[in-house]
């Protein structure tokens, strides 16, 4: 008789189904035509009805099934009676069939921290740049990102009426990453993906030092990591505070599971324990290959300006 799935694999299987539901909610809000936009701190820091509904859906669905989890979400929402339509109780069967890496087989529910970004790329969502948008559910153990799920609600949205809309990517360190086709960036090219809406002199100085052949300015940390694993960019360079732990936790897992690397600008691993500060104050540097080339070119002036 096969052993029952471990806590980690059950959690990932749930997160997959919950992320798929989240993608449906994101599309429904657009279809209904009222985004319910609120400015949180400034004109580039927005929250929509989709952010609010998806956060309630993800956090409530996870908390009901895994009550001992620590769940940290981007949006501050008042406690409310949850609409049952927002609850997802399913678990993706294909994930439950996968073996749990042995180093995680004895993990208890209370040892895990889940970082949730209900809508990564909110500004782009409000502007109709729908392929930039992702839903991110990252899972951390002992401060390290070990499993993650990314839903792209509008994947294929420009591929014609017969295309399947949306996809869900998932991964576990030691097992692999699934739901996409791994592709290398063009050999010998330095293609940088970076922020679309949070540019600064530091960001510009750091990118210039990389001697880029091309610079892609797009929204969403999840979207930028997907560009790396699908060969559209060589490095994600963001020499600035701004992105948070819920932006990087899930994408980092997917990248690391296929041999890539994500750190801060100093080369330090990011920490995801529940007490950690939410801001990635020393920026982000990520690559699928050739990490050392990009890390070696970060100017000392940039490092001096960004304190971990």
Curated annotation (Swiss-Prot):
Mg(2+) 3 binds at residue 74. The active site is at residues 51, 122. Mg(2+) 2 binds at residues 117, 120, 247. It comes from the Eukaryota. Binds 3 Mg(2+) ions per subunit. The modification Phosphothreonine is found at residue 122. The modification N-acetylalanine is found at residue 2. Keywords: Acetylation, Hydrolase, Lithium, Magnesium, Metal-binding, Phosphoprotein. InterPro entries: CysQ/Inositol_MonoPase, Inositol_monoP_metal-BS, Inositol_monophosphatase-like, Inositol_monophosphatase_CS. Coiled coil: none annotated. Inhibited by Li(+) and Ca(2+), but not by Na(+). This is 3'(2'),5'-bisphosphate nucleotidase 1. It comes from Bos taurus. The lineage of its organism: Eukaryota, Metazoa, Chordata, Craniata, Vertebrata.
């Amino acid at each position: 008789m096969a052993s029952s799935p471990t806590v980690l694999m059950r959690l990932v299987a749930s997160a997959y189904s919950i992320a798929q539901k989240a993608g449906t909610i994101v599309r429904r809000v657009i279809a209904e035509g009222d985004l319910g936009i609120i400015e949180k701190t400034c004109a580039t820091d927005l929250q929509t009805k989709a952010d609010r509904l998806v956060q309630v859906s993800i956090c409530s669905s996870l908390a009901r099934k895994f009550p001992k989890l620590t769940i940290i979400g981007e949006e501050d929402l008042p406690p409310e009676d949850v609409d049952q339509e927002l609850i997802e109780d399913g678990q993706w069967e294909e994930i439950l069939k996968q073996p749990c890496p042995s180093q995680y087989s004895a993990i208890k529910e209370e040892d895990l921290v889940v970082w949730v970004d209900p809508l990564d790329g909110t500004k782009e969502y409000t502007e109709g740049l729908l392929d930039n948008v992702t839903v991110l559910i990252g899972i951390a153990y002992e401060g390290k990102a070990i499993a993650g799920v990314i839903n792209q609600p509008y994947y294929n949205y420009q591929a014609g009426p017969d295309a399947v809309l949306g996809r869900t990517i998932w991964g576990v360190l030691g097992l692999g990453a699934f739901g996409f086709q791994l592709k290398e960036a063009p050999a010998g090219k330095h293609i940088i993906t970076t922020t679309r809406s949070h540019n600064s002199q530091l960001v510009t100085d750091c990118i210039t030092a990389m001697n880029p052949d091309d610079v892609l300015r797009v929204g969403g940390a999840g979207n930028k990591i997907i560009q790396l694993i699908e060969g559209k960019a060589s490095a994600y360079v963001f020499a600035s505070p701004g992105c948070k732990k819920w932006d990087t936790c899930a994408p980092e897992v997917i990248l690391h599971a296929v041999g890539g690397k994500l750190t801060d600008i100093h080369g330090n691993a990011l920490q995801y324990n529940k007490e950690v500060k939410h801001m990635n104050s020393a920026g982000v540097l990520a690559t699928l290959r050739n990490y050392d080339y990009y890390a070696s070119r970060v100017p000392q002036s940039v490092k001096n300006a960004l304190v971990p």
